[in-house]
Amino acid sequence: MIVHSLDPVLIDLGFFQIRWYSIAYILGIILGWLYANKIIKSTEENKYNFVQISTQQFDSLIVYLVIGIIIGGRLGYVIFYNLEYYSQNFSEIIKLWQGGMSFHGGLLGVVISIIIFSKKRKISFFKITDIISCVAPIGIFFGRIANFINGELYGKISSLSWSVIFPSAGNSPRHPSQIYE
């Protein structure tokens, strides 16, 4: 059994912290963007171009996606996990540095961003989601590693040798389900 003791803060300058979770977002977005550009460039030369979006258009799309991830992820957390608190403390919603994002809110934000972008640029929603589905696992991978580092989203109690004791969940070992995904 392993006892989870990872610090979610990578760098602490006292007045400013850099957390593993923010690094996961940054890496996921940058590596996803680079991989998408590689896919787009390779299919531009192919007569079976399934992507039908240029690298310049994808660069513009990234701005929409980042906004969708951040706003959707935060609002998802606020609505699904702590609506009562945030309805009483409305100004706390914008304090992203205090934590609180949700995958399903981020996903909804991304879908809305793609809908807006596709209508504005007159590009098929499904052509955009084709490329997004290829690169999204990169971001999800880094996000789940950050969930493990944060000691959140742990699995059921387990007696397996690779189970992890997450102190925030009590003394019972649990599946490290974050890294299974």
What are these regions (language model features)?
Residues M1-Y180:
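Hydrophobic, membrane-interfacing alpha helices
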